[in-house]
Regions:
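Blade-level signature of beta-propeller repeat domains, shared across WD40, Kelch, NHL, RCC1
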Residues: 276-298
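WD40/WD-repeat beta-propeller blade-loop signature
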Residues: 9, 19, 43, 53, ...
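Conserved strand-to-loop turn within each blade of WD40 beta-propeller repeats
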Residues: 26-29, 69-72, 113-116, 155-158, ...
């Protein structure tokens, strides 16, 4: 299935949590949209409120609400069903990435990685910043929770990876060496043991979340050309495959065990920026691109 979303391009997509019957898209035309992917492929709702291109998007665990960040420097909390904006916050900087806390009881907590090197922790109940994590030396590109939400990992233009205890604004572990490149996208494996990072030297590197966050040198996934784009990386729900788009519009699947390319295909006319596995069906993947389309693969 191919959905033509926006002439300006699609920055990110997210499946509706736990069910995957709908896809939420973040457009470069400033609009968020929700699509019926199991049936008609129709746009069910358009969410208007941002003034510039969207940067990131994240659902709450139950799907009733979602968060958007935009180049207009605003972060918004939306009601998925009614389309109403529940709350808007701004720090005066662009939030490059937004992540809701994974715990069902802490959905009011949001982390936003910013263009000014800071990670801000918002509480939607208070409508304000409750904590600042300020140790990166460049813009923050990704935030990934691990260890059941007790820790999170951030990547930055400063080419480092930092591990934090949630709620404590001091880096617990700092990972950097001269051979490392910037890693603008990351994903946690389904078993929670591994973090995969999209590195800008055209490879996906893997770190353990358990053993002092060491790099697993045996696990490197290559063959794609990300060309400086923050192409999303993801694991299949069973953990057997890793997927990523690339700068040429291709979509790659690697075998987790062997690290070999399992399959690659031409998915889009421009960069395949987003790629999401269906939460229930192993064989289904959705991709989005700056060519303005969302595609649903089986």
């Amino acid at each position: 299935m191919c959905i033509r979303d926006s002439a300006k391009g699609v920055q990110a997509i997210r499946f509706f949590p736990k069910h995957g019957h709908l896809i939420l898209s973040a457009g470069l035309d400033s609009k968020a949209k929700i699509w019926d992917v199991h049936g008609s492929g129709k746009c069910m709702r358009t969410y208007l409120g941002h003034e510039k291109a969207l940067k990131d998007i994240t659902f709450w665990n139950d799907g009733t609400r979602f968060v958007t960040s935009s180049w207009d420097k605003k972060v918004k909390l939306w009601d998925t069903e009614t389309g109403a904006v529940i709350s808007t916050v701004t720090s005066g900087k662009v939030a490059y990435c937004v992540k809701s806390h994974p715990d069902d009881d802490q959905q009011n907590v949001l982390l936003a990685g910013q263009s000014d090197k800071k990670i801000l922790q918002y509480d939607w109940n208070a409508g304000d910043v409750v904590q600042e994590y300020d140790q990166h030396l460049g813009a923050v590109n990704s935030i990934t929770f691990c260890d059941e939400g007790r820790r999170f990992v951030s990547t930055s233009d400063d080419k480092s990876i930092r591990v934090w205890e949630f709620g404590i604004p001091v880096t617990m572990k700092y990972i950097a060496d001269p051979t490392m490149h910037s890693a603008p996208a990351a994903a946690l494996s389904p078993n929670g043991n591994w973090l995969a990072f999209q590195s800008l030297d055209n490879q996906i590197t893997v770190y353990s979340t358990k053993d002092k966050f060491r790099c697993n040198r045996k696990k490197v996934f290559k063959g794609h050309s990300n060309a400086g784009y923050a192409c999303q990386v993801g694991f299949s729900p069973d953990g057997r495959f890793v997927a990523s788009g690339d700068g040429d519009g291709k979509l790659f699947f690697w075998d987790w065990k062997t690290c070999r390319i399992f399959k690659s295909l031409k998915a889009h006319d421009k960069v395949t920026i987003g790629c999401e596995w269906h939460p229930l069906e192993q064989s289904k993947v959705a991709t989005c691109s700056w060519d303005g389309t969302i595609k649903y693969w089986d």
